[in-house]
Amino acid sequence: MAKSYEYLHEFFEDVCNIEDRDKRIVFVKENAFKQAKTILQLCYNDKIKLDLPIGKPPYRPCPEGRTPSSLANAFKPIGMTVKGNKVRRLKKEKVFIGILESIHEDDANLLVAAKDGNITTFQKKKYSKITKSLVEAALPELLK
């Protein structure tokens, strides 16, 4: 039975806490939810890129004590920021900043890292076990 997650970073931390690669693959297959899959695609699918500058944009993290938006609601407009979308670049940046400001700060950092394709190297390699080969083995459809 799939585990339910309120935050993206909790899912990715759970994946990295599994030492055995085969068990990690099974865990990802059974527990990856839509927004986690979006992060994996942004990071490892060469056909899906966001039309945004590299690096962390200027934004205000979701304040302590305020409940972040649900991931499902927060991620709805992310398609507007994809390369090839006819939305103006400034609007894409505003949409992306809006997403970052509405989610948990750790999830926002994860999303920025995925956008830049460096999920395995940011935050002192916290998510180094989430590699392209892991995604290929667990969810190959995300890379097609």
Predicted features by range, described:
Residues 1-144:
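N-terminal nucleic-acid-engaging modules of covalent nucleotidyltransferase systems
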